[in-house]
Regions:
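Extended aliphatic helical segments
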Residues: 8, 19, 23, 43, ...
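A general alpha-helix detector
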Residues: 14-18, 71, 139-143
């Protein structure tokens, strides 16, 4: 599967609109700065490496994150209607978590986590459109990269 360039662009605008609408103050400013700084990588990233998994195509990451945000907001509304205690978190925190839930897939700040596979056999027979980038450690210290980039939020 793939999505056209217009949809990738529209998905990016939707993604940014979630930040604008649900995130406030300095946290919003920091997120917009970070995501705009990494826009080129993020808009083309896949959400997963294998065709059988979700969104393993260019533009898949932001498409996936947008759907996670929408799902989180819908679940929040359903939980509220069912009488669940939704006062233990804010909608801002919920959206913040949804926005950033897969950020480690970005890589380590120097290298991408997933790179296009050059192995035609694995692509054809296993559906592995991307491979894990061996230049970065599995479960690399992305936290430290992100922490320094998202200081204070």
């Amino acid at each position: 599967m793939s999505i056209p360039a217009e949809q990738i662009s529209s998905n990016w605008q939707t993604f940014q609109s979630y930040i604008e609408k649900y995130i406030k103050g300095d946290r919003k400013d920091q997120l917009l700065k970070f995501y705009n700084q990494h826009q080129e990588e993020l808009v083309l990233m896949p959400a997963s490496h294998k065709k059988a998994y979700h969104n393993a195509f260019p533009g898949g990451y932001i498409d996936h994150v947008n759907r996670v945000i929408e799902c989180a907001l819908q679940l929040h509304n359903v939980w509220g209607k069912m009488g669940a205690d939704t006062t233990t978190y804010t909608v801002e925190e919920l959206v913040f978590a949804a926005i950033n839930h897969d950020l480690g897939k970005m890589g380590d700040g120097v290298e991408y986590a997933h790179i296009p596979s050059k192995d035609e056999w694995r692509k054809k027979n296993m559906g592995e459109m991307y491979q894990f980038n061996k230049k970065i450690a599995y479960m690399s210290p992305i936290f430290f990269f992100l922490h320094s980039s998202l200081e204070g939020i």
